[in-house]
Regions:
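Short amphipathic alpha-helical segments
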Residues: 8, 21-22, 39-42
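Short alpha-helical segments that sit at the start of domains
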Residues: 1-13, 65
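Short amphipathic alpha-helical interaction segments
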Residues: 32-44
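Short acidic, hydrophobic short linear motifs in intrinsically disordered regions
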Residues: 17-28
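Minor-groove-contacting beta-hairpin "wing" of winged helix-turn-helix DNA-binding domains
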Residues: 58-63
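Amphipathic alpha-helical interaction elements
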Residues: 29-33, 50
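A short, conserved structural fragment
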Residues: 46-56
Length: 65
């Protein structure tokens, strides 16, 4: 699975509320071939300013709805 395949999966997990980083990883893990795939998709979303991490360790969507 490519990083682009994972982007909508991650965004879907974040659509209702911020999610703790570890919990997000656990939810996405079944779709990963390697743990570095998670790092890649998170880097991509951060670079696109689509997701960020708050001071509580929660990942949240930055995109306007």
């Amino acid at each position: 699975n490519s990083t682009l395949y994972l982007v909508p999966l991650v965004l879907n997990e974040l659509k209702d509320a911020p999610v703790m980083l570890k919990d997000l990883y656990d939810r996405i893990r079944p779709h990963l071939e390697d743990s570095t795939d998670f790092i890649s998709v998170m880097d991509c979303l951060y670079a696109l300013r689509a997701a960020d991490l708050n001071e509580n360790g929660e990942v949240f969507i930055c995109l306007s709805r």
